[in-house]
């Protein structure tokens, strides 16, 4: 386990839980694109790095208030943050609540922008 994972208490996830930026780009062009949830704060979401056009902004500190609605969402969910640490934490919360179709954008917005 790497240093950041130990610091944040996050164990490596199943490789199927991660979505590469190119895979997300293709899914966004499909007939049934996933719901993108950006867990960064409003300042980051609207800041210079920007956000994915269709993303919903639900900051991680407000995430618990939205779990029931997100668990019930019929489409697949993709979570994103600046790198991928906060989105991985949010995915863990959703999985604990029973949500199975949830992925984390590998590298977050930094991966998306490269």
Regions found by a protein language model. Name each.
Residues 51-53, 98:
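Short, structured coil segments at secondary-structure junctions
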Residues 43, 64, 85:
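Glycine-rich nucleotide phosphate-binding loop and flanking beta-alpha elements
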Residues 67-113:
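Catalytic cysteine-centered active loop of the rhodanese-like fold, especially the PTP/DSP P-loop
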Residues 1-49:
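Flexible, polar/low-complexity N-terminal or interdomain linker segments that lie immediately upstream
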Residues 47-50, 91-93:
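Short amphipathic alpha-helical segments
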Residues 18, 36, 55-57, 102-104:
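Conserved beta-strand scaffold positions in the cores of enzyme catalytic domains, especially
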Residues 32-36, 53-54, 76-77:
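Short active-site oxyanion
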Residues 23-24, 62-67:
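Short acidic active-site motifs
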């Amino acid at each position: 386990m790497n240093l950041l994972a130990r610091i944040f208490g996050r164990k490596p996830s199943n490789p199927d839980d991660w979505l590469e930026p190119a895979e997300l780009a293709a899914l966004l062009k499909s007939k049934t694109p996933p719901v993108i949830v950006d867990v960064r704060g409003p300042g980051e979401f609207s800041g210079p790095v920007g956000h994915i056009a269709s993303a919903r902004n639900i900051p991680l500190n407000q995430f618990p208030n939205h779990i029931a609605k997100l668990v019930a969402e019929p489409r697949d969910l993709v979570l994103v943050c600046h790198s991928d640490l906060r989105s991985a934490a949010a995915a863990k919360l959703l999985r604990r609540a029973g949500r199975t179709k949830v992925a984390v954008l590998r590298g977050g917005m930094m991966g998306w922008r490269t």
